[in-house]
Each structure stands twice: as C-alpha cells, then as structure tokens.
Amino acid sequence: MQGNEMKIRLNCDMGESFGIWKMGLDEQIMPYIDMANLACGFHASDAMTMNKSVILAKKNNVTIGAHPGYQDLLGFGRRTIICSLEEIKSIILYQLGALSAFCKAHGTAVSYVKPHGALYNDMMRDENIFKAILNAISSFDKNIKLMILSSAKNEAYEHTAKSYSITLLYEVFADRNYNDDGTLVSRMHENAVISDDLEVISRVINLKDKGFLNSINGQKLFLKTDTVCVHGDNEKAFEFIKLIRKALY
C-alpha cells in the first residue's frame, strides 16, 4: 500500500465493471494489493464505476494508476485498434484526464499509467506507440510514471523514457512462463500460463529474495521488478492474492 517500503508491490486491474454488469471482486481484493490499475471508460468502466473505484482505493490507501485501453468495449480492449500516433496520444490523454478528475475530487491523484490489454502489448512491440504514450503522459504531468513489462530491453526503454522526463515502473507476471530471451511465452501455447498456485508463489518469493525467475527452459532471468501483477476476477483468484501477500509480507 502507499508508503509501503517492500521491494515488490502487488498491482491488480480493477474498476472494470460497466453499468449493471459487474466484473471482479474489487471490494474484497483492494485491501490486499498495493496498486490499483483503474479502467478509464474505453475498454471497461463508466463514470459511476470510476468514482466508486477511486473512493475505494483511497479508503484502503492503495496507489492509483490509470489503466487506459483502446476504445473497444465489445472486445474488452483485447483487440488492436489501428490508430495514428496522434490518436494514441489523444486516447491516453482523454482517459487519464477522466480518472484524474475523479481523483482530484476526492483529494488524491493518479500516480502511474499502465495501458490495458492490446494497447499494453502494442506498446511493448512498437517503439512509436511507446513514444506516443510517453508523449501523452509527459504533456499531462511528468510526475506520473509509466508501467511496462520488465525484459532484457529495459535499458533501451529507460533511455527513451528519460527523453520525455518520465520514470518507468517495471512489472513482472508471476503466473506466466517466460522465454529464454525474457519475453512472455505466447498465450497460443498451452504452457503460457502457470496454473499451480504453489509454483507461482514460489516464483514470487524467489524473485523477491534472489532477483530472478527461471525461464521455461530453466535459464535464470534477472528481471528488474518494481511490481508483480495479480488478477482478481473470481473467488479463486482472491484466495490466491491473499496467499501471495502473506508470502511477501
């Protein structure tokens, strides 16, 4: 939570309900995480949901991050929408501004941006999209950080981010297998996701204590880690988050 001095913090996608449709167990999970990635209306969420999510995060002293995505409610932001770089900048500003308004109304602020779904993946694949997102954040508030996937290319991303005066946060997915080059194993492969909770928890503890994860072939991957992503869409995920938090803290 805010002010926590632990090396690794837990982040979770939240505030993804829409109207009468409910997604996730936000009220149950919020007390067990450190950073909440709040949807901003394009892939999920709405005005009332954003307002309630900000109130809930502040109540639990959880750091608030904007979780902007492509304008794709039907696809939940998991499909790439072809956009110009100016459009990318604009959709980031639009969503960041919306969430920031609710934060300001409740005496808090957006601390970082973590793009959602396809936009996150496209940012990591395309340097121009990465730059467009940095440009948007920098023009809005240079104190807001950008969360990206930790990889072997951290140094290059860091160099680019510095030219926009933006600080990066490095994220690791404990429940995903990694290739030897530090990239995530594609979800097209059946072994992309680690389903054994005890194995995932062991990986998180190993990452915290020794600073590395084992790749799918057993190679040590030393990944800079500011935060670990956890998911909270169902009751099983909620119980899992509690186990991870107990192991780390």
Walk through the language-model features, giving the residues of each:
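Glycine-rich tight-turn/loop motif centered on a GG-T
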Residues: A36-H43, L74-K89, T183-I194
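Active-site rim beta-loop-alpha module in soluble metabolic enzymes
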Residues: S151-F212
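Acidic (Asp/Glu)-rich catalytic clusters
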Residues: E27-P31, K52-G65, K104-H106, S138
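Glycine/small-residue-rich loop that forms an oxyanion/phosphate-binding "nest" at active or ligand-binding sites
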Residues: L73-Y112
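A short alpha/beta connector and helix-capping loop motif
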Residues: F18-M50, E127
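C-terminal helical cap(s) of enzyme catalytic domains, especially alpha/beta-barrels
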Residues: A57, N206, A237-Y249
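Catalytic beta/alpha-barrel core
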Residues: L38-H43, D122-R125, N143-A152
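Conserved, mostly hydrophobic/aromatic
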Residues: D13, H67, V113, V230
